[in-house]
Amino acid sequence: CETKAFDLEQSRQILTKAGSLGFPLKIHADEFDNLGGAALAAELGAASADHLVKTSDADIQALAKSNTVAVALPCTPFGLAEKDYTPAKKIIEADALFALATDCNPGTSWNESMQFVIALACRYMKLTPAQAIAASTINSAHAIRRSDSIGSIEVGKQADMLILTVSDYRQVGYRYGTNLVKQVIKRGRVYSVDVGYYQTA
């Protein structure tokens, strides 16, 4: 829902039709202009509204009253050399659910690293490392409606974890430009980043 893309009414038509066909709803909105896409997402019960750089205070309140996750994509304004970023602190202070993602695409955000996303969020959106990590894990799971099975380390959930080469979790927000991952655990299988083998946990 953006100028030069779909206007608010077109976005409503598309999302309403998609919802009637059983699709979960997501929208990219308010990246360059506030057309009301975030409030529309909240109204229609979308899983998430993404970008939200220009989202108004009133629309942030609408998100806070809904189950729609506000997803910031800081690599996009970084990649476009923009000065404005998603008002993450306002969103969190309003008690809206807030997540982070890469928006990986070849046009504006060719970045595959969530570690870099966290670093940008700490610098330009003033998140604490703890807030940025939560936004990248359990809150991101909420944004795809899978928080019941992934996103946190809990009994009964899928065993997806990263083992990092840091002595303090806060270094994830402080260090950037290098891969901090030592091992990946996916569905209980352990993958070594260095040598590429895996074993069943």
Indicate where each model-derived feature is located.
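Active-site-adjacent C-terminal substructures of enzyme catalytic domains
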Residues: 24, 34-149, 176, 190
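Metal-coordinating catalytic core of metallo-dependent amide/deamination hydrolases
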Residues: 1-36, 104
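C-terminal cap of metal-dependent C-N hydrolases
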Residues: 136-138, 158-201
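Residues that line or immediately flank small-molecule/substrate-binding pockets and catalytic motifs
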Residues: 3, 53-56, 166, 188
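Acidic active-site catalytic centers that drive phospho-/nucleotidyl reactions
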Residues: 30, 50-51, 103, 160, ...
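Intrinsic-disorder/low-complexity, polar/charged segments
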Residues: 4, 113, 168-169
